[in-house]
């Protein structure tokens, strides 16, 4: 499968750089915490993803990002252009 992932953050704008968080930092965290574990892998073999539905993938990503990305507000995972799931840490 090929998934598209959207990461959303919420917070106050930093007066030093006018960002809530620099997208380069988000990208770096995503690549280190998520991408290297999922890219070109058989998802069923990954701990916690024995049933890799978009719902479960979004929760798995949330759980692996939240400690590194405390401003995380949503993780959306799409399979194709039209169908996906958004997890908000509920």
Where are these regions (language model features)?
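Charge-rich, low-complexity N-terminal segments
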Residues: 1-90
């Amino acid at each position: 499968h090929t998934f598209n992932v959207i990461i959303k953050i919420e917070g106050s704008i930093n007066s030093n750089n006018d960002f809530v968080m620099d997208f380069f930092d988000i990208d770096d965290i995503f690549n280190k915490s998520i991408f290297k574990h999922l890219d070109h892998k058989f998802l069923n073999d990954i701990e916690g993803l024995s049933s890799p539905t978009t719902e479960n993938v979004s929760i798995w990503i949330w759980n692996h990002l939240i400690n590194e990305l405390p401003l995380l507000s949503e993780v959306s995972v799409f399979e194709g252009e039209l169908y996906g799931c958004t997890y908000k840490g509920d």
